[in-house]
Amino acid sequence: MAVCIAVIAKENYPLYIRSTPTENKLKFHYMVHTSLDVVDEKISAMGKALVDQRELYLGLLYPTEDYKMFRKLHNSYTDVMCNPFYNPGDRIQSRAFDNMVTSMMIQVC
């Protein structure tokens, strides 16, 4: 069940965060930012010392049965990136992307 979907920029900040309407909305935003900190720690550790490459593996980031959901999200994200009026690195404000994410969250919940 997807309760929060986030798109993260290459520079490690969120471009888009959407969560289901719950009383714990702030909790999901906090979890996204905390996850970014973990990724950042792994990346910075790689540059400081000789680190075992297996330690950098973050694990499977989505359940295998939800690959269709991931593919749909990726295709919609690609559409946003291909928009000539979108500046890479800006927050995603596309209504089509937002509607697609909302429909995914409704289907899953």
Curated annotation (Swiss-Prot):
Compartments annotated for it: namely: Cytoplasm, Perinuclear region; Endoplasmic reticulum; Golgi apparatus
A GO cellular component entry from the record = endoplasmic reticulum
Key word Transport present in the record?
yes
Q: Which GO terms describe its biological process?
A: endoplasmic reticulum to Golgi vesicle-mediated transport
Listed A to Z, the keywords are: Cytoplasm, Endoplasmic reticulum, ER-Golgi transport, Golgi apparatus, Transport
Q: Which SUPFAM superfamilies match?
A: SNARE-like (SSF64356)
- The answer, when asked if 4Fe-4S is one of the entry's keywords, is no
The record's note on quaternary structure and interaction partners says: Component of the multisubunit TRAPP (transport protein particle) complex, which includes at least TRAPPC2, TRAPPC2L, TRAPPC3, TRAPPC3L, TRAPPC4, TRAPPC5, TRAPPC8, TRAPPC9, TRAPPC10, TRAPPC11 and TRAPPC12. Interacts with the heterodimer TRAPPC3-TRAPPC6A.
Summarize the protein's role. May play a role in vesicular transport from endoplasmic reticulum to Golgi.
| Similarity annotation | Belongs to the TRAPP small subunits family. Sedlin subfamily.
Q: What is this protein called?
A: Trafficking protein particle complex subunit 2-like protein
Q: Which species is listed as the source? A: Pongo abelii (Sumatran orangutan)
